[in-house]
């Protein structure tokens, strides 16, 4: 998957979620990050739980900036926005995911689709507890082999 998705110039692989960033990001986050534009609002939000980064000066700079924004209480907290009204359809603030998504849009970082789920399992023991009922994915086969080894 990585070989087919990344090229030599990519510094990261970030994974696309299903929800609009504007529905999952409070307005203060957009405003304080200078990202209060429709491109940021209308793009799908990334999932921050699984990321791949190439170690290089550019990726280190972006991750350091991500941390800086995540340490800004006005950007990261779940309190209602004070700098502007929440966008139509706003559901709730996804904190670090919101910040990461804004940075990825701004910097044009590489984003992969949902097919990565065929290769990862976050809670691998969970489906074992349901009688080895996996989903037939490659990761399910691999984890079953590990369990039975």
Where are these regions (language model features)?
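Glycosyltransferase catalytic domains, chiefly GT-A lineage
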Residues: 1-149
């Amino acid at each position: 998957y990585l070989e087919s998705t990344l090229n030599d110039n990519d510094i990261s692989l970030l994974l696309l979620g299903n929800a609009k960033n504007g529905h999952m990001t409070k307005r203060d986050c957009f405003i304080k990050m200078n990202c209060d534009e429709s491109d940021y609002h209308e793009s799908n939000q990334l999932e921050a739980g699984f990321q791949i980064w190439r170690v290089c000066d550019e990726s280190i700079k972006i991750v350091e900036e991500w941390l800086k924004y995540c340490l800004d209480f006005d950007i990261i907290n779940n309190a209602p926005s004070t700098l502007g009204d929440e966008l139509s359809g706003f559901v709730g603030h996804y904190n670090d995911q919101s910040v990461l998504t804004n940075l990825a849009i701004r910097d044009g970082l590489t984003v992969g689709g949902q097919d990565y789920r065929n290769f990862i399992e976050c809670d691998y023991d969970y489906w074992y507890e349901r009688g080895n009922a996996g989903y037939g994915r490659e990761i399910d086969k691999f984890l079953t082999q590990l369990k039975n080894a």
